[in-house]
Regions:
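Exposed, low-structure sequence patches enriched in small/polar residues
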Residues: 1-445
Length: 445
């Protein structure tokens, strides 16, 4: 009998249909070792690696009233890897992975960062520092009754304490949990809201084709790449002890996590898109972003914020006669012509344009944006905050695109950006200008 699915069919199927169809678990490595399917030698140090990814994505669209559209989305992704040194006694195993989950961090979303006069004071950071000892006591209580004698107390600045306190302070739905990787029931949605009903109001309808209000919110909690402690000893579940170089034991979870972060963005917090009756488009937006990075290595919270004000305008001139070729835009001729004559001329122009199949459109765009960003380093041990970087930037962009033919597009642009640093020690004001003309040739049209 020939081989089927890579199996030896002379006696029993090996290495098994479960492996062929990807249905085996982590225990398969031990099975393969016991059956002699793996090369066990001190000269071969290549471990057996397994990985698993859990990716949950939820989306929903709501329309509670006419012209009001709400898009909800929630994601949770957990990646876990396992590396087994099966060639050594006891099969030493290393675990690693990463984790991301959408959440809501509105409690301090619009909170200011403070300034130099008040020491960059942050009420949320003060609340976080006040919770550290309470969470340390709760973690320490989990080790009561342990048979391990003379163990060190729980480290107040370890991941087991700081991460739960961090989530409880800056996110919603934590409920005082001690979980480093929040469970599925703590998954919270992000949203995008769009309302277009203003264009139906009498005065607005007379001047605008459309008016849309926009709002979007996104917040993601992330655990960077982590790995298990090589000297970790299990006590109960994910609780255990890490053996130090001097032989002492310190209560700790299995994983060595150096950083976690919360990335939050209002993009925009409030935005208005308008289209006038003459096809002039305008956009006004206010955006904010915030990144909170908790470092267990430096025992700091690095907080960075940016605020953007954006104004944009665009206008399209159809069939614009720039170089005196092609059918120009229609103009009203001097002299007395009847309505029938005008209709004949318009019909003739339409037919001419249709025959050529080319509209020499001129698209213009003007964007003005102002951004202020700053980064603050907050020391958890001392409670002191200091500015580390920041700047303000004003950018003006002007662009015009002209369609020469179905394959050629002429573009002219001008960009000007002025940067002013927040700290005089970090640099000096700079201004950059870019301008030019480009000709784009496309074969796909």
């Amino acid at each position: 009998v020939g081989d089927v699915f890579g199996q030896r069919t002379g006696s029993v199927m090996a290495p098994g249909l479960g492996l062929a169809f990807g249905l085996t678990g982590d225990e398969y490595i031990e099975t393969a070792r016991n059956n002699g399917w793996l090369l066990c030698s001190d000269d071969v140090a290549t471990p057996a690696n397994t990985s698993a990814t859990e990716d949950l994505q939820l989306r929903a669209t709501l329309e509670p009233v006419r012209d009001l559209k709400i898009d909800l989305s929630a994601t949770r992704t957990a990646t876990k890897s396992r590396s087994v040194q099966f060639m050594y006694e006891g099969s030493p195993t290393t675990y690693s992975g990463s984790f991301t989950m959408t959440t809501i961090s509105l409690r301090s979303a619009l909170e200011g960062m403070g300034d130099a006069n008040n020491g960059y004071n942050s009420p949320s950071f003060n609340e976080f520092c006040g919770k550290v000892n309470a969470f340390r006591d709760r973690v320490q209580a989990q080790y009561e009754g342990s048979s391990v004698q003379d163990a060190n107390p729980v480290n107040a600045y370890g991941a087991d304490v700081l991460i739960p306190a961090f989530l409880d302070t800056y996110t919603m739905g934590a409920g005082g949990s001690l979980d480093i990787f929040p469970v599925l029931t703590r998954l919270l949605p992000n949203w995008s809201i769009r309302y277009g009903g203003l264009a139906k109001m009498p005065w607005i309808r007379d001047h605008f084709k459309s008016v849309n209000l926009n709002h979007s919110y996104k917040s993601v909690y992330s655990v960077g790449s982590y790995a298990s402690y090589s000297s970790w000893m299990e006590y109960m579940g994910d609780l255990g002890y890490v053996k130090a170089a001097d032989g002492s034991l310190t209560p700790s979870s299995r994983y060595n996590i150096s950083t976690v972060s919360i990335n939050e963005a209002f993009s925009p917090l409030l935005g208005v898109d308008m289209t006038f009756n003459n096809n002039l488009t305008c956009k006004v937006e206010y955006r904010t972003t915030r990144v909170l990075n908790l470092s267990m290595t430096s025992v700091h919270i690095n907080e960075s914020q940016s605020k953007d004000w954006v104004i944009g305008m665009g206008y399209k001139i159809s069939n614009f006669n720039l170089f005196g070729s092609g059918s120009g835009s229609s103009r009203k001729a001097a002299g007395g012509k009847g309505r029938n004559d005008d209709n004949k001329n318009n019909s003739s122009k339409t037919q001419t344009t249709s025959k050529k199949g080319i509209n020499h459109d001129l698209n213009t765009r003007l964007d003005v944006s102002f951004r202020r960003q700053a980064a603050i380093t907050r020391d958890i041990a001392s409670g002191v905050s200091s500015a580390s970087s920041g700047n303000s930037a004003l950018k003006i962009s002007l662009q015009a695109d002209y369609t020469l033919s179905r394959m050629l597009t002429l573009t002219a642009y001008y960009d000007r950006q002025t940067n002013t640093p927040l700290l005089s020690s970090s640099g000096y004001p700079t201004t950059t200008q870019d301008f030019g003309v480009s000709l784009k040739f496309s074969l796909t049209r």
